[in-house]
Amino acid sequence: MLKYALAFTLFAAVCAAPAAAQQAKQDFVLVNKTGYDISEVYLSAAHADTWEDDLLADEDDNFGDGESKTVHFEPRVKTCLWDLKVVYDEDDSSAVWQDINLCEVSRITLRYNAKSGATTALFD
């Protein structure tokens, strides 16, 4: 029985490998813990002159407080350093982070401090 369990585990690992290979190393989860809805999310290669398209453009709703979204990159994308911009739904104010190494970061958690008025990001 142990031989079959080991064979199944190896089979499952081999079958899962192609799916894992399709993930780009820059894929990450964005978590909104700001207390507010976010209406727009943009990425650009670090220090680019323009932002890429709004990542939320195809969605009907805002990125609500407490929600998380997985951002996927095409496997052919090699750039590791990216800038991130979020825009709040309530007043169109924005926050920007530069030079995020998405090859090393898999989760970005956004928080807002009402006393300081600053949005911060925790990179895991």
Place the predicted regions along the sequence by residue:
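Bacterial N-terminal signal peptides
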Residues: 5-15
